[in-house]
UniProtKB/Swiss-Prot annotation:
Main location: mitochondrion
Protein's recorded name: PRELI domain-containing protein 1, mitochondrial
Keywords, in A-Z order: Apoptosis, Lipid transport, Mitochondrion, Transit peptide, Transport
GO-annotated cellular components: mitochondrial intermembrane space; mitochondrion; nucleoplasm; protein-containing complex
Job description of the protein: Involved in the modulation of the mitochondrial apoptotic pathway by ensuring the accumulation of cardiolipin (CL) in mitochondrial membranes. In vitro, the TRIAP1:PRELID1 complex mediates the transfer of phosphatidic acid (PA) between liposomes and probably functions as a PA transporter across the mitochondrion intermembrane space to provide PA for CL synthesis in the inner membrane. Regulates the mitochondrial apoptotic pathway in primary Th cells. Regulates Th cell differentiation by down-regulating STAT6 thereby reducing IL-4-induced Th2 cell number.
PROSITE patterns in the cross-refs: PRELI_MSF1
Keyword field contains Secreted: no
Superkingdom of origin: Eukaryota
């Protein structure tokens, strides 16, 4: 049984800009799990397509229950191969990625197609597919569920990283994420509530003092 993922995202930048950002997206604040990237092969075909292969080293900690199944000396780093085909004439880029170690535990294969958005030629559409499989007897389903959840989390980080690099390349200040904005709003609301509480205490204290003074006048 294989877990399948299908998703579609849109970047509000042109295909040329996204293509340029693709090769410059590491490092970024959302890719701390990506340790290294190396181009191991690159060529231009007779029909002017760019073929590339990169080796990425990532750190993805296993769940604790999975760590018990492997020796302590097993590397926690994951080596990922990425093949890409860029067709500048048709403005498409297709990438294929898969892990080459820890394959007994889990294999995650991903295919992405970057193309011009059909509704807005100044935007780029990303169609993403992934297949998560495991050959571990007895726990393969749990491993696949974990792998799919981790993959979805990494997709979110990938898109945030893309937006960050695109903003830098375009000379803009990277926009805050919704989570960061919500967190700041929550902190501000907490500060406002605290200030209001302190003010209320102060007013209550002054009122009590005034009342006490009035009572003393009638004694």
């Amino acid at each position: 049984m294989v877990k399948y993922f299908l998703g579609q995202s849109v970047l509000r930048s042109s295909w040329d800009q996204v293509f340029a950002a693709f090769w410059q997206r590491y490092p970024n604040p959302y890719s701390k799990h990506v340790l290294t990237e190396d181009i191991v092969h690159r060529e231009v075909t007779p029909d002017q397509k760019l073929l590339s292969r990169r080796l990425l080293t990532k750190t993805n900690r296993m769940p604790r229950w999975a760590e018990r199944l492997f020796p302590a000396n097993v590397a926690h780093s994951v080596y990922v191969l990425e093949d890409s085909i860029v067709d500048p004439q048709n403005q498409t880029m297709t990438t294929f990625t898969w892990n080459i170690n820890h394959a007994r535990l889990m294999v995650v294969e991903e295919r992405c197609v970057y193309c011009v958005n059909s509704d807005n030629s100044g935007w780029t559409e990303i169609r993403r597919e992934a297949w998560v499989s495991s050959s571990l007897f007895g726990v393969s389903r749990a491993v696949q569920e974990f792998g799919l959840a981790r993959f979805k989390s990494n997709v979110t980080k990938t898109m945030k990283g893309f937006e960050y690099i695109l903003a830098k390349l375009q000379g803009e200040a990277p926009s805050k994420t919704l989570v960061e904005t919500a967190k700041e709003a929550k902190e501000k609301a907490k500060e406002t509530a605290l200030a209001a509480t302190e003010k209320a205490k102060d007013l209550a204290s002054k009122a009590a003092t005034k009342k006490q003074q009035q009572q003393q006048q009638f004694v």
